[in-house]
């Protein structure tokens, strides 16, 4: 676990990160070893913070765990908020897809340095420095080489096949780690809580598809769902019909007279009610000289006087 400072805050707000050991080593070796950059989120198109290991040339996404009323004790200070940040490895090709899809609408081959351009997120050019980038681009683009320079054009067909492999790899990882996905798929599909689902192959594929969809645009997610032949989630099972209330302008009248059960009647009881054998025996007991139970709990008279 490591701590950092948010330089954008005048109060030098400290952040708590959970990092792999090799990332901590990289930060010690070089001040520029770890770079926090703002890049486009491939799913929403909004800006998001990512971590780049300049030494190992790896990309990490930042996940935040948040709970209310939590704080951190950091050395001799207290940091409010209690946020816990996680850095998890991420395939940079997901971020490049955003620019490849956008350029692909022009329908022509272009050099990569003309595709990955963003005035809003200028650090996107750092994605071009990752090793084996050209090898990865073959999964999602058509490629041409002219005068020793390579040109690329986005391919939907190749991308869907690549994403299908990602889904299959995710399914295998879920099974290997014995992750129960049945209940989670039920919850996300708004199934009835009464319906119990077992971990079927379809549940694994649907859950893996949902995980991958967090890194791609919705339109591409829908195309991937069709490729995987995922059926539409069934509608939620209806609850048993309740008695319908008649809605009208007039006030609803009670069908019974509930005033007959008031406290006075409950205290006195019905005069004509039959007594049990125990009640009859108690009635024959001589109660003369007995104090009421209220006498033991009544307030005592206090003596008052002037001083």
From Swiss-Prot:
GO CC term (a single one): nucleoplasm
Cell compartment(s), UniProt: Nucleus
Residues with the N-acetylalanine modification: 2
The keyword Coiled coil is assigned to this record: no
Disulfide-bonded cysteines: none
Alphabetical list of InterPro entries matching this protein: RNase_H2_suB, RNase_H2_suB_wHTH, Rnh202_N
Phosphoserine: residues bearing it: 292
Residues with PTM N6-acetyllysine: 291
Gene3D superfamilies: 1.10.20.120, 2.20.25.530
Alphabetical keyword list: Acetylation, Nucleus, Phosphoprotein
Keyword Iron tagged: no
Family annotation (Pfam families): RNase_H2-Ydr279, Ydr279_N
BP GO terms, sorted: fibroblast proliferation; gene expression; in utero embryonic development; negative regulation of gene expression; positive regulation of fibroblast proliferation; regulation of DNA damage checkpoint; regulation of G2/M transition of mitotic cell cycle; ribonucleotide metabolic process
Highest taxon, organism lineage: Eukaryota
Family classification: Belongs to the RNase H2 subunit B family.
Subunit structure, as described in the record: The RNase H2 complex is a heterotrimer composed of the catalytic subunit RNASEH2A and the non-catalytic subunits RNASEH2B and RNASEH2C.
Free-text function comment from the UniProt entry: Non catalytic subunit of RNase H2, an endonuclease that specifically degrades the RNA of RNA:DNA hybrids. Participates in DNA replication, possibly by mediating the removal of lagging-strand Okazaki fragment RNA primers during DNA replication. Mediates the excision of single ribonucleotides from DNA:RNA duplexes.
Protein name: Ribonuclease H2 subunit B
Species this protein is from: Rattus norvegicus
């Amino acid at each position: 676990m490591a701590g950092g400072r948010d330089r954008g805050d005048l109060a030098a707000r400290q952040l708590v990160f959970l990092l792999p050991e090799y990332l901590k080593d990289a930060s010690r070796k070089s001040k520029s070893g770890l770079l926090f950059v703002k890049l486009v989120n491939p799913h929403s198109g909004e800006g998001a913070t990512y971590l780049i290991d300049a030494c190992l040339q790896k990309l990490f996404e930042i996940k935040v765990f948040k709970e209310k009323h939590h704080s951190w004790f950091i050395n001799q200070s207290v940091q409010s908020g209690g946020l816990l940040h996680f850095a998890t490895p991420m395939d940079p090709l997901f971020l490049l897809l955003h620019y490849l899809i956008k350029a692909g609408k022009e329908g022509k081959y272009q050099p990569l340095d003309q595709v990955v351009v963003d005035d809003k997120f200028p650090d996107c050019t750092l994605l071009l420095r990752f090793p084996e980038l050209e090898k990865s681009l073959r999964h999602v683009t058509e490629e041409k080489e002219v005068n020793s320079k390579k040109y690329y054009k986005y391919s939907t067909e190749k991308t869907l096949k690549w994403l299908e492999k990602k889904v299959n790899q995710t399914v295998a990882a879920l099974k290997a780690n014995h992750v129960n996905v049945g209940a989670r798929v039920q919850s996300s599909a708004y199934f009835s809580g009464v319906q119990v689902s077992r971990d079927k192959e379809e549940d694994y594929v649907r859950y893996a598809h949902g995980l991958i969809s967090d890194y791609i645009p919705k339109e591409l997610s829908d195309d991937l769902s069709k490729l995987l032949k995922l059926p539409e989630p069934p509608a939620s099972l209806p609850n048993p019909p309740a008695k319908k209330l008649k809605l009208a302008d007039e006030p609803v009248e009670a069908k019974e007279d509930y005033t007959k059960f008031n406290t006075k009647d409950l205290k006195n009881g019905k005069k004509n009610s039959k007594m049990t054998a125990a009640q009859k025996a108690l009635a024959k007991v001589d109660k003369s000289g007995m104090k009421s139970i209220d006498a033991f709990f009544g307030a005592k008279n206090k003596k008052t006087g002037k001083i």
